[in-house]
Amino acid sequence: MKDEVALLATVTLVGVLLQAYFSLQVISARRAFHVSPPLTSGPPEFERVFRAQVNCSEYFPLFLATLWVAGIFFHEGAAALCGLFYLFARLRYFQGYARSAQLRLTPLYASARALWLLVAMAALGLLVHFLPGTLRTALFRWLQMLLPMA
């Protein structure tokens, strides 16, 4: 069992560490711009760091759910690779947003594409899982004819 989910677990841990990094950046920005908790407003430089962290945190549960469902029901390696791309895009998003609101857009779109790809892999994996055995076998035969190298 452990070998079957090791890549997913690794990407999950990387994601958790990235979330911790984002939180530490907010703490650092609070100190730099003298914004004490529970305040969430201050200079624009602080607010951008704060919003970037909150936005990344809001999407993290969606990312984790789709990563694991795609990895278990579609393909672990493909889901893990897509997950790493998503996390890298979120890091670039955070860094860009901290500098200016405009610089967040390109990595935001990249992370959205990665998340939608995980959703598609998860949905396709579940669809195939719930197909009756004869339909599933026919689908796999058709795919093997279509992709003989697979």
UniProtKB/Swiss-Prot annotation:
Glutathione binds at R30, R51, A52, Q53, V54, N55, E58, Y59, Y93, F94, Q95, G96, Y97. The modification Phosphoserine is found at S36. Its main location: nucleus. Disruption phenotype: Deficient mice developed normally and are fertile. However mice display abnormal inflammatory and hypersensitivity reactions. Residues 1-6, 70-73, 125-150 are cytoplasmic. GO terms for biological process: leukotriene biosynthetic process; leukotriene metabolic process; long-chain fatty acid biosynthetic process. The chain crosses the membrane at residues 7-27, 49-69, 74-94, 105-124. It catalyses: leukotriene C4 = leukotriene A4 + glutathione; (13S,14S)-epoxy-(4Z,7Z,9E,11E,16Z,19Z)-docosahexaenoate + glutathione = (13R)-S-glutathionyl-(14S)-hydroxy-(4Z,7Z,9E,11E,16Z,19Z)-docosahexaenoate. Residues 28-48, 95-104 are lumenal. GO terms for molecular function: enzyme activator activity; identical protein binding; leukotriene-C4 synthase activity; lipid binding; transferase activity. It is found in: Nucleus outer membrane; Endoplasmic reticulum membrane; Nucleus membrane. GO terms for cellular component: endoplasmic reticulum membrane; nuclear envelope; nuclear membrane; nuclear outer membrane. Homotrimer. Interacts with ALOX5AP and ALOX5. Catalyzes the conjugation of leukotriene A4 with reduced glutathione (GSH) to form leukotriene C4 with high specificity. Can also catalyze the transfer of a glutathionyl group from glutathione (GSH) to 13(S),14(S)-epoxy-docosahexaenoic acid to form maresin conjugate in tissue regeneration 1 (MCTR1), a bioactive lipid mediator that possess potent anti-inflammatory and proresolving actions. This is Leukotriene C4 synthase.
